[in-house]
From Swiss-Prot:
Name this protein carries in UniProt: UPF0260 protein Sbal_1871
Record organism: Shewanella baltica (strain OS155 / ATCC BAA-1091)
Similarity comment: family membership: Belongs to the UPF0260 family.
Matches recorded under PANTHER family: UPF0260 PROTEIN YCGN (PTHR37421:SF1)
Organism lineage: Bacteria, Pseudomonadati, Pseudomonadota, Gammaproteobacteria, Alteromonadales
InterPro entries associated with the record: Puta_zinc/iron-chelating_dom, UCP006173
Pfam families: CxxCxxCC
Length: 146
């Protein structure tokens, strides 16, 4: 039985916890919240550290030096981070769900995730190039695709 099936999130080692991240890059996108409805909207404006082809952070180990507001996902805050996509492994496991079929821990690579359209690969622009963020709201797959 795989560690994510036999352990709670709180029981996982730091290495196991980190490996849950599929590397989709969606958490690194700028998001908007409608003032009236409180609806959440993702944009294709990506963090300046996000590699647009690999969907990985270019300076992960020292990202807080470059982006102090970068969020650390922990067992203590996972239930508060409602802006994480429904497909996020942390959210799914916290809700008692399984990993999606395309998750790198199940497939052995990120390729299935990219092919399923579940990553930001090739879909984003550098946030520094965005003038009007509302023009960058996206509708591409943000929900679960199992």
């Amino acid at each position: 039985m795989a560690f994510w099936q036999s352990k709670t999130l709180a029981q996982m080692s730091a290495t196991e916890w980190e490996s849950l991240c599929d590397g989709c890059g969606k958490c690194c996108l700028n998001k908007l919240i409608d003032d009236e409805t409180e609806d959440l909207y993702y944009t294709n404006a990506a963090c300046l550290l996000l590699d647009h082809q690999t969907a990985g952070c270019q300076h992960y180990s020292d990202r807080f030096t470059h982006v102090p507001q970068c969020t650390v996902i922990t067992i203590d805050n996972i239930h508060e981070l409602t802006w994480l996509p429904d497909s996020c492994a942390y959210r799914r496991l916290a809700a008692g769900r399984e990993l999606p079929s395309w998750h790198p821990l199940l497939t052995g690579s990120k390729e299935a995730m990219h092919l399923a359209g579940m990553s930001i690969q090739g879909k984003v622009v550098d946030e520094r190039r965005v003038k009007d963020i509302e023009d960058h709201i996206v509708l591409w797959p943000l929900k679960d695709v199992d």
